[in-house]
């Protein structure tokens, strides 16, 4: 049986042992923390006592360990070959370090380089419109675009450095993305250290089945699903990534095409989901500051 590096990282400490079969020279140049060095021949001839723990077998590239793990499974052990071996694990660690550096750079840029154009306008909206209060649990709704990803980082920084204690949930609704788009959203969230919760819907299928105003239907359904999921997760607010330009554009469209003056407002109490509120913390940020 095989186990991926991601699956290994999710195992509870104390429920598994990592056994490194590589040679002494290779191990001297680096090993997985906490692993035990046991050469292949010794491992097969005199395996450790079967305590019920999972055995994660590691070789250089995850090839030799496949046969060894299968042999141990045949003897009653719960053994797994680590996919990619030590090289795969090392590459994963390097990617993590790179992601941490990118995330740190993004956070620093928001508070330093873009302090006036982004951070100050963000905190201005939060204070002026009282968007976040003590004890709030805010579902930050992420579509995967630049605006919602920026909002996620801004809300994280507000939680970290602000004076008002509140909780965050980062919510991604999959309305029917293809695999490539879904993966890109997950990868970007991981790089930015945004712990997303993804839930799936069939909105695209429903919207594509109607001829009249599919965009309007899609938007309405999105909002309803987000409210519903956020409430299910114990949130009392959802945050959307609309910025100043969105507000102006929506107002003008309403005037020119619907003959009505109806603007986006920074916060809105839901009429269909009791106790829920929608907030727009990027209300004062201009789009050219984001681009």
Language-model regions, residue ranges each:
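ATP-dependent adenylation/nucleotidyltransferase module used to activate substrates
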Residues: 98-253, 257-261, 265, 288
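Short, cationic motifs built from Arg/Lys/His that form the positively charged side of catalytic pockets
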Residues: 22, 64, 222-223, 287
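Anionic group-transfer/hydrolysis microenvironments
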Residues: 22-24, 176, 244, 282
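Short, flexible loop segments at boundaries between secondary-structure elements
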Residues: 263-287
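Active-site-adjacent beta-strand anchor residues
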Residues: 20-21, 58, 82, 141, ...
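General small-molecule cofactor/ligand-binding pocket signal
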Residues: 36-38, 80, 169-171, 195-199, ...
């Amino acid at each position: 049986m095989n186990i991926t590096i991601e699956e290994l990282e999710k195992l509870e400490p104390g429920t598994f042992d990592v056994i490194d079969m590589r040679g002494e020279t290779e191990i001297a140049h680096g090993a997985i923390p906490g692993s035990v060095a046991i050469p292949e021949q010794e491992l097969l001839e005199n395996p450790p006592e079967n305590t019920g723990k999972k055995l994660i077998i590691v070789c250089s590239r995850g090839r030799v360990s496949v046969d060894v793990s299968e042999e141990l499974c045949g003897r009653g052990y719960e053994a797994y070959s680590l996919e990619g071996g030590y090289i795969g694990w090392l590459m994963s660690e390097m990617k993590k370090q790179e992601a941490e550096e990118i995330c740190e750079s993004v956070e620093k840029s928001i508070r330093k380089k873009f302090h006036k154009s982004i951070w100050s306008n963000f905190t201005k909206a939060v204070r002026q419109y009282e968007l976040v209060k003590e004890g709030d649990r805010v579902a930050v709704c992420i579509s995967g675009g630049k605006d919602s990803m920026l909002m996620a980082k801004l809300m994280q920084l507000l939680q970290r450095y602000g004076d008002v204690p509140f909780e965050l949930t980062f919510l991604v609704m999959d309305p029917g993305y293809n695999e490539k788009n879904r993966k890109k959203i997950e990868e970007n969230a991981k790089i930015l250290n945004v712990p997303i919760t993804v839930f799936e819907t069939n909105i695209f299928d429903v919207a594509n089945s109607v001829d009249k105003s599919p965009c309007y239907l899609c938007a309405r359904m999105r909002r309803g699903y987000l409210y519903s999921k956020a409430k299910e997760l114990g949130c009392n607010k959802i945050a959307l990534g609309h910025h100043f330009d969105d507000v102006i554009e929506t107002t003008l469209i309403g005037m020119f095409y619907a003959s009505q003056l109806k603007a986006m407002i920074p916060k809105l109490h839901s009429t269909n989901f009791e106790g829920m509120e929608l907030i727009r913390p990027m209300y004062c940020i201009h789009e050219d500051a984001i681009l």
